[in-house]
Amino acid sequence: MIYRVKVSETAARQIREAADWWHGNRGGAVDALADDLERAFDLITRQPRIGKMADPPDPIYSRRIYLHRIHYFLYYSVDDRTETVEVLAFWHASRGSSPEFD
């Protein structure tokens, strides 16, 4: 079973901001961000429980996966009832803190 992807407004904004920066600063790997996001979305729709539970646990029980090549975390939640994964945040690992969710 393949789950649907829903992207929160916050995550969509964070992805747009990262993509804008990436295209302006990563000329040699301009497609890396888009490619890694596409792979991550495919992975979490096919294996929604693959991500580690975020630390500390938050009220929406988010999970996260690390995109090694681009050094970003993708935070998401799983709704088995609607067979949906909702992307909650796209957060660079160097920030050191956890993102705030909608």
Where in this protein do the model-derived segments appear?
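Basic, Lys/Arg-enriched alpha-helical interface segments
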Residues: 1-62, 80-82, 98-102
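Enriched for short, Lys/Arg-rich terminal
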Residues: 67-102
